[in-house]
């Protein structure tokens, strides 16, 4: 991979990073995921056995078992800007026992990958990106031609935005865009939407990087 850190990183709110570092130790207790709904999302990703996957905002590793069920020769780069979240994920999925998984502490804006991945996943994290347009641009660049970018939540946009609004100043203004706005951002960055669902149960948008 040509990846690494950008020499001009996007500044991230220290308060927001501190919020997630503080919550990491109890995250799995205070954040409940319906695993059947997560499985539904994983099923839409079209994971191939040799895919190279970039997961942004891995948290404590909720998606890792769903990737491992599909991968044979592939791998996962699991990224989070919270050092404590990565530490929690490593405890659950030690790299010696999970050789297909590697962890990286980094913000999305610090990444500088170029056509390195078949699949990029933002599960339950997109509202926390300060500049969502720039995030899509960076993640689209990380994809190989034909690769997929997925933004997904196992709840409705209305519920997600409401939870954030009532969660304190650190993430109180972290909202999902409308599905139409997200589709426009995808299109502007050479991505063709191949799956979308925006209802009371899910917010999912998956797009493929076009060949030209």
Predicted regions and their residues:
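A short glycine-rich, Lys/Arg-flanked "PGG" loop and its adjoining helix->strand segment in the class I
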Residues: 134-145
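Conserved class I S-adenosyl-L-methionine
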Residues: 2-47, 62-66, 85-88, 150-176, ...
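Short alpha-helix
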Residues: 174-189
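Class I SAM-dependent methyltransferase SAM/SAH-binding core
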Residues: 54, 60-110
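A conserved beta-strand element that flanks and buttresses the S-adenosyl-L-methionine
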Residues: 121
């Amino acid at each position: 991979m040509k990846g690494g850190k950008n020499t001009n990183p996007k500044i991230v709110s220290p308060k927001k990073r501190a919020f997630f570092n503080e919550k990491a130790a109890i995250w799995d207790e205070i954040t409940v995921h319906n695993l059947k709904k997560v499985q539904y999302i994983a099923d839409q990703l079209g994971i191939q056995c040799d895919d190279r996957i970039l997961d942004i905002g891995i948290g404590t590793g909720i998606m890792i078992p769903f990737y491992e069920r599909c991968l044979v020769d592939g791998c996962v780069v699991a990224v989070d800007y919270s050092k404590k979240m990565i530490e929690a994920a490593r405890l659950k999925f030690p790299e010696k026992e999970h050789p297909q998984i590697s962890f990286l502490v980094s913000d999305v804006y610090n990444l500088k990958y170029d056509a390195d991945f078949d699949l990029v996943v933002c599960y339950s994290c997109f509202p926390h990106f300060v500049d969502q347009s720039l995030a899509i641009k960076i993640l689209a660049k990380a994809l190989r031609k034909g690769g997929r970018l997925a933004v997904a939540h196992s709840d409705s946009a209305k519920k997600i935005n409401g939870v954030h609004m009532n969660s304190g100043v650190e993430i109180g203004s972290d909202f999902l865009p409308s599905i139409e706005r997200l589709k426009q951002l995808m299109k502007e960055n050479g991505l063709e939407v191949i799956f979308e669902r925006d209802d009371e149960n899910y917010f999912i948008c998956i797009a493929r990087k076009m060949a030209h």
